[in-house]
């Protein structure tokens, strides 16, 4: 059992560090019980109910989740880390990596705290496999560009419409292409392009989402949600830049494939 673990008193920093390793190593069982999860929460001064729900739901991935939780030191990061874990799905909790969680905990801030939690720090956009895309875009896009896009998000809409070519044959029935993959290839199916836009926006602290009901890509501002059109319309000279016209082609508007119409679309999901 857990005998011999003393509660923290006074300057118990060193004792706590020694215990941390033994506590981490004690979680070698397949799944975490409610009791063990609550013990862990008390040790790390985390919200017991939330921690228990999350760790029990994470099943065989509880070591990764506990490792992440153990790194949350300040009150602010404890609140933020638990919020992040509650934004993602139960399936995410079962297979997310530490790298992904750490990446999104370091998201750039935006003014509206609620928008930040839901549409910036939240890594989950749609049905994609979660990746550490925030750090990737931080390196790929200069700070100046990121700030320009944040000041005028429609510039990012225009950039994606002009630079990411849509080819719906390039990813038939597979998992969405990762944001990093779309950045490198500059071509994607429409759904992967939409996820790419939202991921890139979030990495620049621009609140964005794919509307769960309509499937439309939206920027989230103080006045609410605004649909954006990421398709390239070469006949409209508004966003035209040098040399874009020659490459442009008319893209028919694309309806996202509903999972019901196409069961293969979700075939990469596992049931457990």
Could you tell me what each predicted segment is?
Residues 215-216:
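Loop/turn residues immediately N-terminal
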